[in-house]
């Protein structure tokens, strides 16, 4: 993970840890003119590693975004931000996106009262995201919420930390996307 972060910059969804600055002498050797191919490849890799996608999944999202109305880049980021694993990460119910994927895969999360075990589930406005009533599920979420620093919540989400409940108000606005993409 540190190799990816050193190469691509900060990826908050992948890990909250940061490499020491100035500790990589190889990085200084790679300066110089960056080709268009390299820039596009790095931006694609940022998306893949931040959201935890395979190449095939990313291509499907690009295809869907290309067919939709509006800017393909903005629609792509909206599609990725409305995934269930990413919304759990944004709500603070998980420290990283891989951690949120694990919560979903282990059936700890309910969407509108139904168990959802697919991390790529596309959330819609007015979806209610809760934990299962089991004590173990609530304890996991409680630990994440207590240990995570309380960052500003995007305006398309609301959370009730005492009931372990989150609500998707609307589709995300482009200014709240946490990843800087060129």
From Swiss-Prot:
Its main location: plastid. Residues 82-143 form the S4 RNA-binding domain. It comes from the Eukaryota. GO terms for biological process: ribosomal small subunit biogenesis; translation. The keyword Plastid applies. It holds the Pfam family S4. Residues 13-34 are annotated as: Disordered. CDD domains: S4. It is found in: Plastid, Chloroplast. GO terms for cellular component: chloroplast; small ribosomal subunit. Coiled coil: none annotated. One of its GO terms (molecular function) is structural constituent of ribosome. Keywords: Chloroplast, Plastid, Ribonucleoprotein, Ribosomal protein, RNA-binding, rRNA-binding. HAMAP family: Ribosomal_uS4_B. Part of the 30S ribosomal subunit. Contacts protein S5. The interaction surface between S4 and S5 is involved in control of translational fidelity. Belongs to the universal ribosomal protein uS4 family. NCBIfam families: PRK05327.1 (NF003717), rpsD_bact (TIGR01017). One of the primary rRNA binding proteins, it binds directly to 16S rRNA where it nucleates assembly of the body of the 30S subunit. This is Small ribosomal subunit protein uS4c. The gene is rps4.
